Regions:
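Active-site helix of classical SDR
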Residues: 105, 139, 147
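Conserved glycine-rich cofactor-binding loop
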Residues: 11-12
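Substrate-binding pocket helix/loop in short-chain dehydrogenase/reductase
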Residues: 81-82, 89-91, 191
């Protein structure tokens, strides 16, 4: 266990699945979020504070002396239409979902060596849009663009940067949302029907791609955005 992976938002959902997968691959895993992640070293982090990213990277280097993989997974989603959204909500969403990954990458770069990998967790909503998700969509589209820019700027140093754009994944948040519906069973079936594979995704399926992107098997892969959405974006809707 000599390689170190930092995963933001590693307490649940996709972040926890990534932490488990990297740990199984003999990485030392450190997570960063508001609350500790069970079974993993954690750094308490409020990513709405622009000072936090530098502090988190400094703490990782202090604890381990190195950083090999950065997974930018932490994020927020606030629902409101453009005409109703406050500037504070817009700024908060972009601060956590886009500025924080930028600052984490910026502070991590001096410690990343050739062969290191950055994986940003974007969203299919950076490629399309659901109603009332203007700030979220803008932040994820920006994160995809940042991914390509980092790949271009730092590829000559052997540092790779890719993004994964998940669709509907069975995280705790999404499960709670389904259970809040009047008829959860019917809603779950309807969600399945909008996917060619007729089901929603699992956090572990996203984590499998993330760990592959960090591996030597993906050594010639950089600047790419990978959708993990069961074919949802590929399927045109019918009336």
């Amino acid at each position: 266990m000599d390689k170190v992976a930092l995963i933001t938002g590693g307490r649940s959902g996709i972040g926890l699945a990534c932490a488990n997968r990297f740990s199984q691959n003999d990485y030392q895993v450190i997570t960063a979020q508001r609350s500790p992640a069970e079974n993993f070293d954690s750094i308490k982090a409020d990513f709405s504070d622009p000072e936090t990213p530098a502090q988190v990277i400094d703490e990782v280097i202090k604890q381990t002396g190195r950083l090999d993989v950065l997974v930018n997974n932490a994020g927020v989603m606030l629902e409101d239409s453009v005409n109703q959204m406050s500037l504070n909500d817009w700024n908060h969403t972009l601060a956590v979902n886009l500025t924080t990954p930028f600052l984490l990458i910026k502070n991590a770069l001096p410690h990343l060596k050739a062969g290191s990998s950055i994986i940003n967790i974007g969203s299919i909503e950076g490629l399309g849009s659901n109603p009332k998700h203007a700030a979220y969509c803008a932040s994820k589209a920006g994160l995809h663009a940042l991914t390509r820019a980092v790949a271009v700027d730092h590829g000559p140093q052997g540092i790779r940067c890719n993004a994964v754009a998940p669709g509907w994944i069975d995280t705790e948040l999404n499960e709670d949302f389904i259970e809040s519906m009047e008829d959860p069973t019917a809603f779950r079936a309807e969600i399945g029907r909008i996917h060619p594979l007729r089901r929603t995704g699992k956090p572990e399926e996203v984590a499998a791609l993330v760990t592959w992107l960090a591996s030597d098997d993906a050594a010639f892969v950089t600047g790419q955005i990978y959708t993990v959405d069961g074919g949802r974006l590929a399927q045109l809707p019918l009336p």
